[in-house]
Amino acid sequence: MAIDLQQDYFSLFGMPRRFRIDESALEAAWHGLQGEVHPDRFAHLPDVEKRRSMQWATRVNEGFRVLRKPLSRAQYLLELAGVDAAIDTNTAMSPEFLMEQMEWREAVEEARAAGEVDELEQLHLRLRQHSREVHAGLADALDDAGDYPAAAETVRRLMFIEKLQHEIDDALEALEN
């Protein structure tokens, strides 16, 4: 078994290069590849073969890690398309989005400060629904329209949303302990 370490992750797993993927097919492909390249299968071979199997296994695991999460999959698709999402340098967002984020954060802080677990859970549910809607827009931008600048902006938006979801989770955990 030889894996081309230069092929993209979608090709590695036999998946179409799209945002919308069959996640169960991805997992099945990952399990299949893991069975073929797992270092234990090469333990009796010379060191060079052991190192090669470790490289293959690392590549397979990294590919699975990137493709199984929608946000990292979107970032990877942008990278493959030659689009720099400028995640670290471009934090400019629309005033409407920033206002929305401030409102979300204020609501989370108020619920946390008041110890309102039910309110935090409701905020979490509403944010999860909002996240689904934004993901759907991202899928449309990447798969249907090929609008990479819009997709890059949506990726940056989703990073804010994901961070807020973690803040709600942390607040819930703090209140429940």
Swiss-Prot record:
Keywords: Chaperone. One of its GO terms (molecular function) is ATPase activator activity. It comes from Azoarcus sp. (strain BH72). PANTHER family: IRON-SULFUR CLUSTER CO-CHAPERONE PROTEIN HSCB. This is Co-chaperone protein HscB homolog. Interacts with HscA and stimulates its ATPase activity. Belongs to the HscB family. It holds the Pfam family HSCB_C. One of its GO terms (biological process) is protein folding. Co-chaperone involved in the maturation of iron-sulfur cluster-containing proteins. Seems to help targeting proteins to be folded toward HscA. SUPFAM superfamilies: Chaperone J-domain, HSC20 (HSCB), C-terminal oligomerisation domain. Residues 8-80 form the J domain.
